[in-house]
């Protein structure tokens, strides 16, 4: 969903000179091609990746740890999120033809799953912190933690629904040269933006910085040949989050405090490009939080064999050998309780 207000409003740009209006028209042509293409790329990649994670987690991997509970809800949220993108892609090329009810529904679904995804990423970070730093306690309370994890996931979905109500209530179809589905309410827009920035960026970012800093310190004092691999994964997770989410959130923050940027066509380009980059998280989450696990990759090849897409080619033995070798790694006696560190 394009996060802008005036791009399609020709009346907004009629007050500017001919050169500015020409730049605006060029931008509109660019956005009609760029955003729908990016939406479809994210949709296809996110659909395939998150569907694989869900199928393997439910039918092959089972729920063996608290992280596994989160890794079922994360691809579910991302999967529903990417399923809204074809609608926004079509509306970007043409106009909104799906009516007001679908407008409110898709705005709600889009926002709910955005918040859910970010909050679950935060919970995964905290869970990894507990398992690595407080390994013995986590191991002894594994059953209790599983129960609490399911409750936490339910609460996350409820909280996401509640904070998405403004988009659902105030979302509507507007006629700005063409029909557009968007959320727009000046009175509460500041509160909505603050909620988006807090739950969707600052909370997961600060949690990652604090928790992963302590985890890195713990791993540096741990033995095992897989220590460096785990550190690389942590740095990769942080780098992907910063590179995909920071630019768009920074642009939104600037836009909310400096309205004069609306008159700059170059700033409009910045918004849609950073927005597209931010949406890549829905494609990358399956790789960062599932496919890094040897057990998950082994189950993936089992799925490939079961559906008959490719010959097995002795893959099972390959992963079995790698998995046995990985078990020599230990930052504590039960680091393997999490999906991330079953590398």
Swiss-Prot record:
Q: What is the membrane topology here?
A: Multi-pass membrane protein
Q: What does this protein do?
A: Receptor for the C-X-C chemokine CXCL16. Used as a coreceptor by SIVs and by strains of HIV-2 and m-tropic HIV-1.
Tell me which Gene Ontology terms the entry assigns under biological process: calcium-mediated signaling; cell chemotaxis; immune response; inflammatory response; positive regulation of cytosolic calcium ion concentration
Which residues are on the Extracellular side of the membrane?
1-33, 91-104, 166-188, 261-276
Entry GO MF terms: C-C chemokine binding; C-C chemokine receptor activity; C-X-C chemokine receptor activity; coreceptor activity
List the disulfide bonds in this chain: 103-181
Q: Where in the cell is it found?
A: Cell membrane
Q: Which GO terms describe its cellular component?
A: external side of plasma membrane
Q: Which residues are glycosylated?
A: 17
List the Pfam families: 7tm_1
Q: Which family does it belong to?
A: Belongs to the G-protein coupled receptor 1 family.
Q: What is the name of the protein in this document?
A: C-X-C chemokine receptor type 6
Coarse class of the primary localization is membrane
The protein's UniProt keywords, in alphabetical order, are: Cell membrane, Disulfide bond, G-protein coupled receptor, Glycoprotein, Membrane, Receptor, Transducer, Transmembrane, Transmembrane helix
Kindly give the PANTHER family that the UniProt entry links to this protein. Answer: C-X-C CHEMOKINE RECEPTOR TYPE 6, CELL ADHESION MOLECULE
